[in-house]
Amino acid sequence: MLDFRRIDSDRSAYIPLLLEGDEDMAMLNRYLDRGDLFGLFDNEDVVTLALVTAEGDCAELMNIVTVEKHRGKGYGSLMLSYLSKEFSAYGYLIAGTGGCSPARLFYEENGFSLSGLRKGFFLQYDHPVIENGRMLTDMVLYRKRIG
C-alpha cells in the first residue's frame, strides 16, 4: 500500500538516494536540514523522496528522486501532486533542473511552466556537472501555481 510520510528523524538514512537527485554532498547539506523531507512509501520501502523549502510566497522543490527500479511508473508525478496540496498555502511551487535534462519534460507534463534561469548555478558545485554529455552552467527554473 502506498502512503506519503513526512520524514522528521534520521534523514541521514536517505542521503544515498538524495544524492542521486543532487550529486554534490556540499550542496545537499545546504538544504537538507532546513527543508521538509517527504517520502512515498510502498509498505516500509521508500519509492520516492522529495525535499521542499518554503519561504515567502513560494515553496521550492530542492530535490526529488525515485528509486531506480520504480522510475517511469508515475511515482514522481504522484509526489508532485501531493506536494502541491501540502504546500497550497504558498502561491507557487518552484523547481530547478539542468538545461538538457529529461526532468524538463517531467515538470512540463506536471503543469510547471518555464520561469527563468539561475545563471552560473552549477559552477558552484565542487566538480563539473555533466548531463547528456554537456557541462551544465545555468539552472533552468520552472514554476507551478499551487495556491
Regions found by a protein language model. Name each.
Residues R5-E68, L80:
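Acetyl-CoA-dependent GNAT
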Residues E86-G99:
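Conserved GNAT acetyl-CoA-binding A-motif
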Residues G35, L136-Y142:
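Short hydrophobic/aromatic beta-strand or adjacent loop that forms the aromatic wall/cage
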Residues H70-Y82:
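Conserved acetyl-CoA pyrophosphate-binding loop and the N-cap/start of the following alpha-helix
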Residues S77, G99-E131:
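Conserved active-site alpha-helix within GNAT-family acetyltransferase domains
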